[in-house]
């Protein structure tokens, strides 16, 4: 009777595998949940940041730079912020920046708010909006995340950092796209910057040949057909179609021969006249039908060569 008792080692291994699978599924679920929480956090932070940027864009530059005591004194003098007048120097700088942008062909910024009362401060608000918007972006990049349970859980795993690069790209996107030169497309690799080796002729190979040269040489090369293969001479290097060196069989002697593969070896025919009793019948029994058909085709080719050579000699 075969023993049906399960070994303890296999049972223990199966339990360990089950525990690892459960832990892996739990980690996958936690990762998906953390990703969803991060997406919600990013969504709400971007909404709040957008509202703050909108408010900062509506406030004039001098008004935004005021300190708290000055703001309190300003509340006593003004009924609303739209009545605040910028100084003459600020208006001059704003008008110069607006005229410079108009000469360069850039449209002036239209992010500033339209006050209920149109006064002389509208021209100065256009130049101050971009500066306030840029300052708010830079201040938002320096904000630190509030530590909490989510932050400690994320610290256990290597995740993508939420750096300031994503927000700073908005600043760079306002610049006009620069026209890249033709030299950037062909970049020098590290090997080209090193000391060059001695120049040598590189053979064409299947792994080094460019695609265009492969297509040019994809056709049949100018080599004779398979019935007229030539063995390399002693000391001659045999190359493949694409120039790779090959290990080829070298003829030891300079004479014609015919090699016939049989089941237990190769039957080599030398240019020597054979008698009928020299041909062993047990060797011919090892020939299969395909090899016999190949020998017949080879016999016809040899007979054709003999006839052509005889006609060429007698002419």
UniProtKB/Swiss-Prot annotation:
Positions of post-translational Phosphoserine modification: 152, 163, 205, 218, 220, 244
GO cellular component: cell cortex; chromatin; chromosome passenger complex; chromosome, centromeric region; kinetochore; meiotic spindle midzone; nucleus; spindle midzone
Sorted UniProt keywords: Cell cycle, Cell division, Centromere, Chromosome, Cytoplasm, Cytoskeleton, Mitosis, Nucleus, Phosphoprotein
Compartment annotation: Nucleus; Chromosome, Centromere; Cytoplasm, Cytoskeleton, Spindle
Lineage top rank: taxon: Eukaryota
Location of Phosphothreonine modifications: 146, 209
Molecular-function annotations in GO: DNA binding
Biased composition (Low complexity): 178-188
Amino acid composition bias (Basic residues), ranges on this chain: 153-162
Tissue expr: Ubiquitously expressed in the early embryo. Expression is restricted to the ventral nerve cord and brain during later embryonic stages.
KO phenotype (gene knockout): Flies show multiple mitotic defects, including multipolar spindles that result in large polyploid cells and often in delayed apoptosis. The developmental consequences of these defects include cell-autonomous and non-autonomous defects in cell-type specification and tissue architecture. Flies also display a drastic decrease in histone H3 'Ser-10' phosphorylation, suggesting that the CPC complex mediates phosphorylation of 'Ser-10' of histone H3.
GO BP terms: cell division; mitotic sister chromatid segregation; protein localization to spindle microtubule
Keyword Cytoplasm recorded: yes
Region (Disordered): 103-126, 138-226
One Pfam family this sequence matches: Borealin
Family listed: Belongs to the borealin family.
Purpose of the protein: Component of the chromosomal passenger complex (CPC), a complex that acts as a key regulator of embryonic mitosis. The CPC complex has essential functions at the centromere for ensuring sister chromatid cohesion, recruitment of the CPC to kinetochores, and chromosome alignment and segregation. There is no function in meiotic histone phosphorylation or spindle formation.
Protein name: Borealin
């Amino acid at each position: 009777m075969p023993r049906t008792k399960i070994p303890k080692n296999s049972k223990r291994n199966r339990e360990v595998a089950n525990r690892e699978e459960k832990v892996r599924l739990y980690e996958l679920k936690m990762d998906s949940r953390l990703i969803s929480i991060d997406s919600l956090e990013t969504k709400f932070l971007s909404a709040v940041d957008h509202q703050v940027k909108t408010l900062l864009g509506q406030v004039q530059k001098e008004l935004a730079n005021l300190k708290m005591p000055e703001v309190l004194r300003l509340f006593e003098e003004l009924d609303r912020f739209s009545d605040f007048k910028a100084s003459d120097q600020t208006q001059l700088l704003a008008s110069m920046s607006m005229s410079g942008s108009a000469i360069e062909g850039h449209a002036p910024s239209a992010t500033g708010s339209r006050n209920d009362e149109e006064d002389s401060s509208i021209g100065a608000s256009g130049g101050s909006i971009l500066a306030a918007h840029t300052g708010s972006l830079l201040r938002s990049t320096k904000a630190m995340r509030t530590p909490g349970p989510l932050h400690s859980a994320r610290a256990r795993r290597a995740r993508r950092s939420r750096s300031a690069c994503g927000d700073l790209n908005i600043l760079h996107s306002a610049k006009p796209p620069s026209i890249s030169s033709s030299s950037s497309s062909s970049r020098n690799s590290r090997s080209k910057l090193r000391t060059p080796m001695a120049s040598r002729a590189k053979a064409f190979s299947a792994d080094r040949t460019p695609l265009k040269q492969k297509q040019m040489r994809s056709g049949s090369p100018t080599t004779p057909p398979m019935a007229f293969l030539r063995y390399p001479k002693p000391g001659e290097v045999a190359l493949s179609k694409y120039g790779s060196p090959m290990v080829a069989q070298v003829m030891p002697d300079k004479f014609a021969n015919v090699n016939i593969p049989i089941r237990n070896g190769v039957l080599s025919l030398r240019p020597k006249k054979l008698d009928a009793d020299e041909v062993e019948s047990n060797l011919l029994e090892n020939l299969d039908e395909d090899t016999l058909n190949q020998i017949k085709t080879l016999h016809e080719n040899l007979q054709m060569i003999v006839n052509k050579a005889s006609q060429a000699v007698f002419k």
